[in-house]
Every structure is written in C-alpha cells, then in structure tokens.
Amino acid sequence: MVSITLPDGGVRTFPRGTTGGQIASAIAKSLGKAALAVKIDGKQRDLALPVEQDCRLEILTRESPEALELIRHDAAHIMAEAVQALYPGTQVTIGPAIATGFYYDFARSEPFTPDDLVKIEAKMHEIVNADAPFTREVWKRDDAIEHFRSIGEKYKAQIIEDLPATETITIYRQGRWYDLCRGPHLPSTGKVGHAFKLMKVAGAYWRGDARNEMLQRIYGTAWRTEKELADHLHQIEEAEKRDHRKLGREMDLFHVQEEAVGSVFWHPKGWALYRTLENYIRTKLDAAGYVEVRTPQLYDSSLFKASGHWDMYGDNMFKIRESVAEDGTEKFLGVKPMNCPAHVQIFRQGLKSYRDLPLRMAEFGNCHRNEPSGALHGILRVRNFTQDDAHIFCTEDQVGQEAKEYFALQLGVYKDLGFDKIAVKLALRPDVRLGTDETWDKAEESLRVALRANDLEFEELPGEGAFYGPKVEFHLTDAIGRSWQCGTLQLDFQLPERLDASYIGQDGARHRPVMLHRAILGSLERFIGMMIEHYAGKFPLWLAPVQVVVATIVSEADAYAQTVAETLRRAGLRVEADVRNEKINLKVREHSLAKVPVMLVVGAREAEQGTVAVRRLGGKDQEVLALGDAVARLKDEARSPAGAETVSPAF
C-alpha cells in the first residue's frame, strides 16, 4: 500500500500501482471526470501513470492554475498532427506552451499562408472531436533515433542524440500520430476543448542559431473557455490600437531606424515626456535621501572580470578590442551593461564608517546590452537604454528598514503614474548559492517583514532567487490586463566581496556592506513604451508631451493666440500655438490624434474679451474662462505629483 497526502492534509491509502486517475475517481466520481493530470510531490504527471510510493498528491482540473499550460501543450501536439495530415512531408521540430498560447516549428519548403492556418485550425477541431487518448510509451534510445531518421524526421533524431545518455526517451501517441515528448499530457485530445485559435506564422532558426536552417513557426493561443479566448482576442485587438510604435509616430515622440538598431531617436515632444518622467523620479529620490552620481560608459575588462559579469554576462555585452600585445594577448574594453560595478567603485573612494550607512546611490545610468536583433521591439526592448538605477549600501541590520522604505517609495511612484494593480513576488534561495543558510534566513525574513509592513500580499517563488541573494519583483497590470515586470529589489552579498567594498564597524573592524540593487521603473525607454500603451497616448496633463494647444478660429485672433501661449509658457506649461489658416474642425481632429489633453480655442470674441474656450480631449463641450482663470486652473492640474518644484521641460 502507498499513503497519499492530499492538499487538505488528509491521508488516504491505496494499493501500490494505483494510477492518479483511479485515485481521483476514488475520492469522488465527479473529480475523476474533471481530472486532467496529477502533481506528485510537486511534479506534474499523467493520470495514467501508477503511483509507486508514498507521496503528496494533488489532482489537477480545468480550474487549476496549471491547467492552461497542459491545454496549450496538447494544443501544440494537435496542431502538429493537423499540419502533417494536411501537408505530408512537413517535418516537426519543437512545440512548447508559452505565456499566452503555444507554437510549433516546422520544416517545409512551401510557406504557410493565412488560408493554410484556417485549414489547419479546422483540422485541429476534428482531432479534438475524435477524443483520441494520449498514451505514453518508453523507447530505447538507439531505436528512437533510427526510427525518426527512417521516416525523415531528422530534427527529432537530433534532439534525441543531444539528450543525456541517462534520459528516458518517451513518445506520446494520440490516435495514429505520435511525437517525442517528456509529457505530461491530458487524458485525451477532447479534453483540450475548442477554445483555441491560430494567430500567425513567423520565421525561426533551428535551435535559435542563425547559422542553422530557417523554419516556419506557427503561433496559436488556447484557453479554458470560449469566453477566455474571446477576452484574449479582444485584448490583442485593443493592444494593436495602443501599440506604442503606432502612437509614437502619430504623437511625434520618437522613431527607430536600421542605422542605429536597438537605439531610440527621441523627438522634441518625446524627449519632453522623457525628461518629465526623469525629473519626477529625481525629485522623489532627492526627498528619500538618495545621492545622484554619474559613471563612465567604457571600462577595462578587468573590472567586469572581477565583478563576474565578463564570464556570466559576457555574451550580452558590447566589447571593444583596444590593443594586441607582442605575445598576442588581446586587451578588451567593455561597454557597461549595468551600473552596479561602477557604483561600488564610488563607494570604495575614501574610508567608510558604519555612520555613513545606509548610503543610497542613484544614477540615471545609460547602459548597452547586445540583445539579438530578432528580440528588439520598438522602445520596449532595445540595446541602448537608461535605468533609474540605485544601490543602497547598508549593514545587515539595516536591510529590513531600507527595504520597507523603498517599497513605500516604489508603491507611491506607481500610484502617481496610474498603476494600482500590482502583483509582488519574492524569489527565494536557489540550490546553488553563496553565503550561509543563516544569512539567507535573515535576508529572506527581512524582505518578508518589509513587504508585510507595507501591507503587501506576495507570492513566494522557491529556488528562483539569484545565487547571491533573494529578490522582490513588482508586476504591474495595465489598462487592458497585461502584466509587466518593472521594479525590483535584490539583495547582494557577493559583489561587495568580489570588488572589495568595506566599511569600519562599531567594533573598529572592517565589514562588507550589504548591497541592495533596486530600480523602480527599470528601463525608462521600456516604461515609457508601456505607459504609452497603458494610457493609449492619453497621458494625464502633468505627463503629456504637449499639454495645451492654443488654436485660432480666424486669423484676426493670431496675435492673441500667441499671447495666450506665451502666458501659459511662463506658467510652466508645455504649449503650442496653432495659427494655421485651416478650419477649426481640422485642427481639433489633428490635435486629438496627437492626444493633446487640452485645446484653448480663440476667435475674435475671445481676443476682444480676454477669454479662452477650453476643450478637453475626448469631450464635446467647451467651457469659456477668463485667460487668468484658465491659466491658474491648468497650472494647478499640471502640477507634478512629486511637488510644485518639479521643472516642466519645454520641447
């Protein structure tokens, strides 16, 4: 007999070899029908596999968080079967579940077309309706390689050849079709349901290597219910309308081009937005006791070798060969991918005492990372970016209070910027790590206490911390429900040791400071791209690149319009005067497309009376105000949440 511990703590005994599916049915017939898979001691397994030893067991159903990954994994297999049924000779490679769906890479001489996707999707529905069971088989390694080569599936043969010799080779069948797969799978194709859709075809190199063959990747999405699918498709449609690249052009904020791949050309209006955000963060940091620094871009490789980045992060760095010695030894420089080693260099200048701690060092640091060209995306994923980076050097006893204060600062910033749905995750010690268990216990508990002190609910992620310390991640939900990982706080016990940072403690001896890596926005470029999509370009007045446009109805009001614009400018507002000889409806339409929050419409009457007609973006009504009243109201509305002293950059 085996003892099964259930999620509620109850213990049941079953004959050794009882399957997960049989256990589910024994608990309740309805559970047996709803079961999709099981988790045994935290690992997912097929329902049909026997349970051979005592364990903790959880029955996974369609409502389980893990269900979507299982559904999407099976949908990828069903799509591959459909493709090979419709287009014989197509070779299959890999097909995983991903964040919102699945994909499968195919080797085929003819390109897939939109019409092909319609046919493949229809065939997938047929396969689901057939409700063929998924069955698991274990094959001998050599037999599997020989078999796949014999049927022309060279990619599958390569995958098996590259697996460790100890790896069990498993094949899953669904009807007459089969594929190499570790599993687990649902009981049958019918359990996938019909809430799926094929989305697009893209190119992909075999194993992600540009030196290999180009394959065709078909992307799909799959969900538990038709409603979830419809909601997701609506979100995609809404995201296309909000695409920061499209709005960036319409609002004249920035552009990117091939001659500077992965870098942003900020236009005057976009740079005004950038500087407004930067100045806001700077004001918040000043109030929180940070000192701002500026560090170089280019360093001798010795610094990055000492910090560990040359070995651990070297492939993502831009390197410059500076010289070659007579013996052939090459000397390299590295463009910094992050700011932390440089901040340690500043900390090391001069003797530091425990009285100097905590030291909060901030920088709007310009960094470069050698991202693959295929991964670049507008300003959301670039090679050259600026981080609102800071490092807090403190004692171990100060970690909890510093984390608490940082979380409060971070949450305040997100609220000011319009984000109130925040998921917090605490990544805990990995198996391979530096430091003692006692140090990790203290660090992890300090972060827990700090999170609770800010009334933050958080999810713990065992094993997902960095090898040098635990990490807190902040995930923001935007206006259409997408999640973005932004801020982080990471404890680092390693870098101060590697780069020989120390302070004199109360005992007169040298000690290593704890280093807290933290960023609120992360990359400013990425955060601005995210905000453009979150607000659909309709920024609150204080952030808007152009806050006010003064538009004339008749040419007789041109001089007055310029006077109004100058008055607003002196009040600190970002303003344009539109005195073109065009109809007012055209001006309204164009400035609405540019997402200008406020238009002040002036004609002969307004010029004579010293008034303006205030028109809000998206509104149909106008409010006539005296110029002085309008300026006072708009100045107050445009006040930065960081305080009245924040400068409003002109463009």
UniProtKB/Swiss-Prot annotation:
Highest taxon of the lineage: Bacteria
Entry's localization field: Cytoplasm
SMART domains in the cross-refs: tRNA_SAD
Cellular component GO terms, alphabetical: cytoplasm
Secretion signal, residue range per the UniProt entry: none
List of residues binding Zn(2+): 340, 391, 517
One example of a Gene Ontology biological process annotation: threonyl-tRNA aminoacylation
Pfam families found in the cross-reference section: HGTP_anticodon, TGS, tRNA-synt_2b, tRNA_SAD
Gene Ontology MF, one: tRNA binding
Family per similarity comment: Belongs to the class-II aminoacyl-tRNA synthetase family.
Function: Catalyzes the attachment of threonine to tRNA(Thr) in a two-step reaction: L-threonine is first activated by ATP to form Thr-AMP and then transferred to the acceptor end of tRNA(Thr). Also edits incorrectly charged L-seryl-tRNA(Thr).
HAMAP family linked to this entry: Thr_tRNA_synth (MF_00184)
Identification of the protein by name: Threonine--tRNA ligase
Gene behind the chain: thrS
